[in-house]
Amino acid sequence: MSEGDQELRALMTRYQGGSLEAFQEIYAQLAPGVRRYLSHLAPGSEVADDLLQETFLQMHRSRAAYNPTYAVRPWVFGLARNVFLMNRRAARRWAAVHESREDLPEFPVLPEADRLGSQDEIRRCIAHLSPDQAEALLLHHEWGFSFEEIAGMLGITAAAARARASRGMADLRVALNNLQRARA
């Protein structure tokens, strides 16, 4: 367990006991990454901001159920994913939101992809991956979650998370190489 994990677990335990300062520190540490993740899932800053607020509201409501043996960061990212999925189901039901994977917001690029194309090209290529591949790829390579943590967030096995990320990276490499050849 990393020092950051231990600190977040201690903060969460204090938050469960009613510490507002502990919540503020958890929010300060996790909100930027959770927002980037939600921006990937739900393009459009206004929607991502709303989902971020809903995620931390859900964390507040669920704080008593939090198990201190589980890492806080993947737990909160899992809450964010669930909030996104509930929002998407509601949007489909009411036809209120039209999503476009082409309008992904800015986000840091994958380290090895940086030399293969511009951020816009990489974004377009990621947008054409299957949603499962793109999500696993970004959770692992961009946000640094282990395959076990991804498995817990997505409700799949660690092997399935690894396979999705691996296939996504392979498809991304092919797409970026095709773009490079087309430019040459």
Features from the language model and the residues they span:
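C-terminal edge and immediately downstream basic/flexible tail or linker adjoining helix-turn-helix-like DNA-binding
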Residues: 2-3, 14, 43, 110, ...
